[in-house]
Amino acid sequence: MIGAGDKRTRAFLFAIIAVGLVLRIAAAILLPEQNFPDAVLYREQARQLWQSLSFDDPYRMPLYQILTALTGPGWRALAFDVFLSTAAIWLSFQLSLALFEDAMTALVTAFAMAVYPYFIFYAVVGLTETLFVTLLLAAYVCWYRGWFTAAAICSVLSILTRPTFDLLAPVLVIYFSLLIHRLTYTATAKRVAGYAVIYVLLMAPWWVHNYHAYGTFVRLHLGANLTLYGSNNPNNQSGGVSDVNQDFSQFEKIPDLVERDRAYRDAAIKYIAEDPVRFIKLAGLKFTRFWRPWPYAEDYRTPLYVVGSIVSFVPVLILAIIYLLFFASGHFVRIFPLLLFIGYLTAIHMIMVGSIRYRLPLEPFLIVFAAAALVQLAGRRFRPP
């Protein structure tokens, strides 16, 4: 048995991280430029930020574009994404170690993260996923270690990347404080207050920007209700937002962006209330899209992508389910924060857009569970802390 701090563990971890780095560098060199519309837009926004210190996109959060502007679009931004993705390997090791206190399980987790095709792919395509996943993992590691201030900083930075985590983070502060670290109610209240202070301090510049841009307080951005309506309207047939029959012309006539945002929200709620059966059917379609083993987009439904996706994701999913069914019974309280995020993210994308791209942030948690199952099935029993 190897321990978490002995030389063999450190050597294995270093080798795994090196393999992950080499694979990401190879992908950066060999993978053709994908030119995702979002990636092209992020690069243009980074140039705009660098040249004029302006950010005029009402539908996106700014942190990834700010970091791209600071590193410079091109190979330096790519290198930074590769660094973040490689750091996520180390963070996954730390998360598994914090959960199970078993070095072998942590090493298997790190190895899976290092070679997992989706993490390699997203490390080199210029999207926000890599930054968001790295910050999310960092927040969870810090919470499990009891570093609430660092966890709060990582959480809010993840919200400034993508606002997905906004509603769940304060709930997790309470859960980790009361049930993982067994702090008193007074100490928990202090942790929540600390999170609130950090949230305000880090979000305040963005709020000032939004107030100058829109003349009113906008806490996150104006994209959520656009997506809500795009995902819930009579013309949406697939559960995505790329249906050819989508029509937003009635809203584009509204010049005020905040009023337009409210109109999107009201129209979506009206549609859901008037046809709840259709809403439920769409939610089912979105669930299927979200958990589908291979990509939905036509460009990525070639045999290579389909087989590669199935071979990588399906074993992880099956092993994660095996862990949850057969090995997690005495460990539920400790793993619940991961399960909560998996359920939370799934629920959001059953209401909003269903896409395997948006599933990526929960896949490190599936890998953690899968690694635990694999080690248990191999006969190395461990007792959860």
Predicted regions and their residues:
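Membrane-interface transmembrane helices that cradle and orient dolichyl/undecaprenyl
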Residues: 1-2, 98, 139-150, 176-183, ...
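Short helix- or helix-capping micro-motifs
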Residues: 20-23, 106-117, 141, 155-159, ...
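Loop-to-helix entry region of an early transmembrane alpha helix in multi-pass inner-membrane enzymes
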Residues: 62-66, 72-90, 107-110, 122, ...
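Transmembrane-helix motifs of polytopic, lipid-linked glycan transferases
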Residues: 76-100, 115, 138, 318-325
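Specific aromatic-rich, kink-prone transmembrane helix
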Residues: 91-95, 112, 131-150, 155, ...
